[in-house]
Each structure stands twice: as structure tokens, then as C-alpha cells.
Amino acid sequence: MKQFKRGIERDGTGFVVLMAEEAEDMWHIYNLIRIGDIIKASTIRKVVSETSTGTTSSQRVHTMLTVSVESIDFDPGAQELHLKGRNIEENDIVKLGAYHTIDLEPNRKFTLQKTEWDSIDLERLNLALDPAQAADVAAVVLHEGLANVCLITPAMTLTRAKIDMTIPRKRKGFTSQHEKGLEKFYEAVSTAFMRHVNLQVVKCVIVASRGFVKDAFMQHLIAHADANGKKFTTEQRAKFMLTHSSSGFKHALKEVLETPQVALRLADTKAQGEVKALNQFLELMSTEPDRAFYGFNHVNRANQELAIETLLVADSLFRAQDIETRRKYVRLVESVREQNGKVHIFSSMHVSGEQLAQLTGCAAILRFPMPDLDDEPMDEN
């Protein structure tokens, strides 16, 4: 996601000027826009004109419109958002108050204005602007002269740097040029890695190559970090996993991720973390039901007693058309975090999110049993 301008006041009102660059960005935008928000974007309007003789002709005209959103339709396959609303600014082509549908797609600039940017909105916005925050896996696939430095988010793989250099061939009696070329290559890859990979965030770093290239690179990376005052801690070194890949091309990463030993190592990453939390909740419902509750009233009551260890929330609840419904879930998330509880926001595009939605979309694992909660109504009705 690209941000051109941000004007959000302390009271939460304000606007941002954005442009989606990746398919995943459209999903973030869908989760940001709500009914009542104001969208300003370039669009196409069919204009019908009539001549003095009574004949009519129509043409499609580009214009800039500002609409107050009344309906939102997202097509995940086409990665398009269709936003229908009334025009709220004077325009030579479209009358004030006339309906129009603005179509948003990747690489189309737009302005989003809200009367309230809450903490979930800002979290989602910052996540979209810096995908590295969501990437808990980094990978370097390489062979001599070619390397791809990638970040893997729950939704996609992002190439952060591609290093392509010509390495002089190794010749008998003339190995120095080859070794200098390799040294220069490893230095370039190390620099790119340190720039794009945040070892405070990622849980695992895969370094993959044929032969011993990965080992030589790893030695150089450690030395590079030491020389630049960023020496790896024991904990950070433990995050690295060296494995085989067929090449340094990006497509080789797919093969690497599918190998059993890598899949096992990645079992505790964010995407897997949500599945793990849901499975733990479902297991507790069978073994310790007084520590596993779902439905807003039960979960909110547990939160009032500072009992929530892990909160599970479906992102669809933050897309509620009723502002007060959204606000109560935002307040719940903020409160649980303030009490040092864990919060997992599940995507409705994933199977685990669909499963949570069947349990009202809101569930909690408690720090201690609360048997009396069963006596209270699950919902407000």
C-alpha cells in the first residue's frame, strides 16, 4: 500500500490518500471502508446529451467524484471494490445528491475520509503500509550470483530485494577474481537482508541454496552484522534455518516451503498461531468448558473480571454497519490488550475465520474458570 498524505487529527477525524499496490492491499481497504465514510476518486460517468433536433448521444467521461458510501461490494477474485453512494460535492457532470458507484482497484489513487479513525482502523492502516509488520517468516533463496530476499505474510510472499550479479568463473590458478566476486555478492545480499528483515518481528529465517552457498552466505551475514554493530543474539541466531533449494529464483521458495522439515519449523508462525489458538479453544470447550466461552456478553463479562488470556475475534465484526456494534468490539480488543491478554483477529478469507464466525465470531480462553458465566444470557436479547 502506498500512502501519499495523512491528515488524521487527535480526535480521530481526518483523511488519508492511498493507492493499493498488491492484491492483499485491496483486502485491507475493504476492511477500512465503512458505510458513512467519504471516498474521493477518479471515476467514469456515462453522460447523455441531446441536440437541438432531439437526437441523443452518450459518451463516457472521466471525472473526480466525492461520494458518501452507502453500500460496499468486494470482489476478491477480481480484486475490485464497488462503492455506491451519493455525490456530496458540486460537479459539472454529476448532480449533487446523485448516486454513483466508484470502482477501486490496484494502482488507483483515492482519498478516504472518516469521522472516526479508531485503534483497529489505524492498526489495519499501518499494517497495510508496512507489510513487514505482518511477516513473521523471512527467506533468502540463492545461488552464486542470484539471490531473492523475501518476506512471507499470512496472505502472500513479498520480494523485498533481488540481487543479480555476474561472478567471474573459477579458473585454475586464478581463483582470486572468483572469490572477490563472491565476496561482493554476499556483501550485497547481507546489506539487503539487514535493511529489509526485522529480526525482532520474524520468528523464522529460511536460507536456502544448492551446495554450500547457504553456509558461506550465513558466515558472511554474521560477520556483516558484527562489523555494523548489529551482532546477532543467541535467540536471533536460533531463528535461522539452512536448507536445500534448486536455485536462487523466487519460484524455488515454493518447493522449500513444502518440505516437511520447513513446514514443521513454520508451525508456530502467525497464520498457524491463529489455527493453534482456535484449536486450543475448541479443545477447552470439551475438557475445561468453564475456561472457554463465546458470544459477546459472556466474553465481555469475563473481560470485566480481568479473566481473558486469549481473545479470538473475526474481522467481519469490525465491518458491522452499526457503528455502536463496531465500537464495542474495538473497546473489547483495546481492553484485553491493556490487561496483557493476547488478541487474534481472524480473517474471514481463511478457514479458521469461517469456523470462528460460526461461534458468533467472538470467543475467549480464560486465565481461570468462571462457572457462573453459564447462568448469564449469551447475547443481549
Curated annotation (Swiss-Prot):
Cite the InterPro entries for this sequence: eFR1_2_sf, eRF1_1_Pelota, eRF1_2, eRF1_3, Pelota/DOM34_N, Ribosomal_eL30-like_sf, Transl-rel_pelota
For biological process, the GO terms are: cell division; meiotic cell cycle; nonfunctional rRNA decay; nuclear-transcribed mRNA catabolic process, no-go decay; nuclear-transcribed mRNA catabolic process, non-stop decay; ribosome disassembly; RNA surveillance
Q: Where in the cell?
A: Cytoplasm; Nucleus
Spell out the molecular function terms from Gene Ontology.
metal ion binding
Tell me, in one coarse class, where this protein mainly resides: cytoplasm
Asked if the record carries the keyword Methyltransferase, the reply is no
Per UniProt, the keywords (alphabetical) are:
Cell cycle, Cell division, Cytoplasm, Meiosis, Metal-binding, Mitosis, Nucleus
Q: Which domain of life is it from?
A: Eukaryota
This entry carries the following GO cellular component terms, namely: cytoplasm; nucleus
Can the keyword rRNA-binding be found in this entry's annotation? no
Short name of one Pfam family: eRF1_1
The protein's required cofactor(s) are namely: a divalent metal cation
Q: What does this protein do?
A: Component of the Pelota-HBS1L complex, a complex that recognizes stalled ribosomes and triggers the No-Go Decay (NGD) pathway. In the Pelota-HBS1L complex, pelo-1 recognizes ribosomes stalled at the 3' end of an mRNA and engages stalled ribosomes by destabilizing mRNA in the mRNA channel. Following ribosome-binding, the Pelota-HBS1L complex promotes the disassembly of stalled ribosomes, followed by degradation of damaged mRNAs as part of the NGD pathway.
Annotated family: Belongs to the eukaryotic release factor 1 family. Pelota subfamily.
Spell out the subunit comment.
Component of the Pelota-HBS1L complex, also named Dom34-Hbs1 complex, composed of pelo-1 and hbs-1.
| UniProt-recorded name of the protein | Protein pelota homolog
Give the organism, scientific name: Caenorhabditis elegans
